C-alpha cells in the first residue's frame, strides 16, 4: 500500500514521508472543518494542506493546533471555523454524508459515483469521467 501511495504522490507532485508516524489518524475534526469550508470555497486548499500535514509533515491531524495552523495559513478565521464545524447541524450533515456513502457502497477513498454507478480508486477517475460523459439510453 505504501509503495503504491508513494508512486501516486510522485506522479502528482505531492510530498510523502514514509513510514508514517501515526496511521491511521483521526480525521473527524478535519472532515467537519472541510464540510463547513465548502460554501467559502476553501475546502480544496484545506484538504490538500491536511494531506500534507498528515503524509508529508507527519503531524497529528486530529490536533486542534495543527488544524488551526492550517486554517490560519489559508486566511480562514479559525475560531469561527471551529465554532461552525462543531454545531449540531454540521455534525448531523457529516453523519448524513457518511450514511449516504455507506448506503451507496463506498468503502474506500477515493470513490466516485455517477448516478448509481460506483468507481473506486484513483486509477478509475478517467473511467468515471468517461461514464459521466456517455449518453445513457
Question: What spans do the regions from the language model cover?
Answer:
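C-terminal cap of thioredoxin/glutaredoxin-like
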Residues: 49-137
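Structural alpha/beta surface segment adjacent to cysteine/selenocysteine redox centers
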Residues: 1-54
Amino acid at each position: 500500500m505504501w509503495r503504491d501511495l508513494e508512486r501516486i504522490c510522485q506522479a502528482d507532485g505531492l510530498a510523502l514521508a514514509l513510514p508514517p508516524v501515526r496511521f491511521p489518524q483521526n480525521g473527524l475534526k478535519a472532515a467537519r472543518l472541510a464540510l463547513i469550508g465548502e460554501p467559502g470555497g476553501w475546502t480544496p486548499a484545506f484538504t490538500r494542506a491536511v494531506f500534507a500535514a498528515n503524509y508529508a509533515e507527519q503531524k497529528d491531524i486530529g490536533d486542534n493546533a495543527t488544524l488551526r495552523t492550517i486554517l490560519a495559513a489559508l486566511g480562514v478565521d479559525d475560531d469561527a471555523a471551529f465554532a461552525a464545524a462543531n454545531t449540531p447541524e454540521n455534525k448531523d450533515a457529516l453523519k448524513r454524508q457518511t450514511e449516504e456513502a455507506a448506503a451507496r457502497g463506498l468503502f474506500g477513498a477515493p470513490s466516485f459515483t455517477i448516478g448509481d454507478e460506483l468507481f473506486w480508486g484513483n486509477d478509475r477517475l478517467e473511467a468515471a469521467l468517461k461514464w459521466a460523459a456517455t449518453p445513457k439510453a
